[in-house]
Amino acid sequence: MPLTRRRALAAAAATALFTTLAACGGSGGDTTAAVASGTTAVTVGALSNGAAKEVTINVPVVDSIRAQLPPQIRDAGVLNVGLGLLPAGSPPLGFVGTDDKTLTGSEPDLARLVGGVLGLEVQLNNATWENLFVGIDSGRTDVGFSNITDTEQRKLKYDFATYRQDNLAFETLATSNWAFTGDYQALADRKVSVSRGTNQEKILLEWRSKLQAQGKDFAVEYYPDNNAVQLALESGKIDIYLGPNPGVAYQVAQSADSPSPKRSAGTFSGAGESLQGLIAATTKKDSGLVKPVADAINYLIQNGQYQQWLGAWNLGNEAVKTSEVNPPGLPITNT
């Protein structure tokens, strides 16, 4: 189906869905409607089962930013947003809400706020991590909001509009005395889990190569989702999980009163030891969308909605002062 035709159908379907939800008194879904002018009310932290403090944030359409949109997106009135949360989600970044259908989390909520500034209906498309990028490559997805790290390798295919610091954390059982203080030598002889295709995997495998050159090693284990990772930690199949700091902080808080409490055993920049990592909205390279997305994020930063969003999800310590387009990211060779 031609892209323009598909967008038109998506816009019509999204409008119909929003009208139905409003008539029933519903609160959200995988489509968030915005108006081409005026103000949109976005409920941040909805259906989060206590992971966030629910707050309604008003977002006006900014005509000067909307005018920068690629014509096919502006005319269709829909922003197709990609999320890489399948199969089990990743609280607090993104997961299925308490109604068992609505996608909630810090990442979809920011996408909804950006859509409000741009005067676009936000259509959330959830996929596996790998298929998130397939969607962007194919044009089915306009932009990814899914804790995507700015890396130089990814810049070969994508443009980035940054919106949060990228910090990684090492999760262990609370009973473990292992700690990471910046020296990868501490990983020797440990069993470590990480997600495939991520910047943290790249960093971890480079550390492993350096240790192997010294005659040392550690095991790298992969699991299909975060639930399996937590079970592996609790059963002793792994010693350490390396993942996004917000997710580790969430697991530590959730497990505090459980039989197997967890703790954060240290953090590391998602861009390596010489650069502060950054999380970014991700568009197909040279699509023309990255600048209006960055400008929309900067509008939210300058007018306080960004701070409300971070506060609702307890991510204030990962705030950035400005959204940048394609700043330096994790080097292709992190040496």
Residue ranges of each PLM-predicted region?
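Bilobed "Venus flytrap"/periplasmic-binding protein-like clamshell domains
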Residues: 88, 101-117, 148-150, 167-225, ...
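Extended ligand-binding regions for polar small-molecule ligands
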Residues: 38-63, 111, 116, 176, ...
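Acidic, polar ligand-binding/catalytic clefts
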Residues: 121-186
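Periplasmic-binding protein-like
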Residues: 165-172, 256-295, 316-335
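Bacterial signal peptide processing site
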Residues: 25-28
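C-terminal motif of bacterial Sec signal peptides marking the signal peptidase cleavage site
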Residues: 19-23
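A ligand-binding cleft/hinge motif common to bilobed small-molecule-binding domains
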Residues: 148-155, 204-206, 210, 239-275, ...
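Extracytoplasmic small-molecule ligand-binding "clamshell" domains
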Residues: 35-144
